[in-house]
C-alpha cells in the first residue's frame, strides 16, 4: 500500500499526541476508567476519479483534511495520522484518518452544532451527535465543491449499511492497518 505519511498535530505535537492527551485528560479529571471513550476516529474519503480528473494527490488531500479538522474540531488535540493514496484494496480512493482526543483542551467560540450548555468549554467531552455529523458531512461536501472535487451526497441515506465489524471481516489486513491498530491501543 502506498501512503503519504505525514503526521500533523492540532493543539499538540504529533510525536507526543498520546502523552499530551493523557495530560489533558488528567487536568480535567476525565477518561479515568478503562471503558471511557478516549478518542474519536474520523475518515475523510475522496472519490478515486479526483486523482486523474482533478489532480488530487495525497499531499493535497492532507492539506484539505487538515483545514477541515481545524474547522470541525476547534480546541481539541487532533492528529491527522495518515493519508492513504491508493485506498483499501487498491481501490484508488484517497482518504485521511483523523484522531481527536475526546476532551477539549481549550475553550472555543460556540458552534451551531453545539446543543448542550458549556459544550464550547475546555474540558468538555466530544459528542458525535447527528447534528454534529450532519454539519461535518455538509462541511466536507462544501469544501470538496470549493476544491473542484467530485462529491456524493453524504446526507442521503446509504442503500445498505454495514457495521465496522462487518467491513473489517470483508477485507484482509495490511501493514498500515496493523500499524493503525497498534497506534490506537495507545489511546484506549
Question: Which ranges hold each PLM region?
Answer:
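N-terminal nicking endonuclease/strand-transfer module with a His-rich metal-binding environment
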Residues: 1-188
Amino acid at each position: 500500500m502506498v501512503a503519504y505519511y505525514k503526521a500533523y498535530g492540532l493543539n499538540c505535537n504529533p510525536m507526543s499526541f498520546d502523552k499530551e492527551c493523557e495530560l489533558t485528560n488528567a487536568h480535567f479529571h476525565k477518561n479515568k476508567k478503562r471503558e471511557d471513550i478516549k478518542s474519536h476516529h474520523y475518515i475523510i474519503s475522496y472519490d478515486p476519479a479526483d486523482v486523474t480528473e482533478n489532480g488530487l494527490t495525497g499531499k493535497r488531500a492532507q492539506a484539505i483534511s487538515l483545514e477541515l479538522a481545524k474547522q470541525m474540531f476547534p480546541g481539541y488535540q487532533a492528529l491527522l495520522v495518515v493519508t492513504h493514496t491508493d485506498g483499501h484494496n487498491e481501490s484508488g480512493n484517497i482518504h485521511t484518518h483523523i484522531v481527536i482526543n475526546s476532551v477539549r483542551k481549550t475553550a472555543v467560540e460556540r458552534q451551531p452544532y453545539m446543543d448542550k450548555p458549556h459544550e464550547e468549554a475546555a474540558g468538555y467531552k466530544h459528542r458525535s451527535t447527528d447534528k454534529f455529523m450532519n454539519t461535518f458531512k455538509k462541511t466536507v461536501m462544501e469544501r470538496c465543491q470549493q476544491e473542484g472535487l467530485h462529491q456524493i451526497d453524504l446526507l442521503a441515506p446509504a442503500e445498505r449499511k454495514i457495521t465496522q465489524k462487518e467491513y473489517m471481516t470483508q477485507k484482509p489486513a495490511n501493514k498500515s492497518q496493523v500499524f493503525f491498530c497498534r497506534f490506537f491501543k495507545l489511546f484506549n
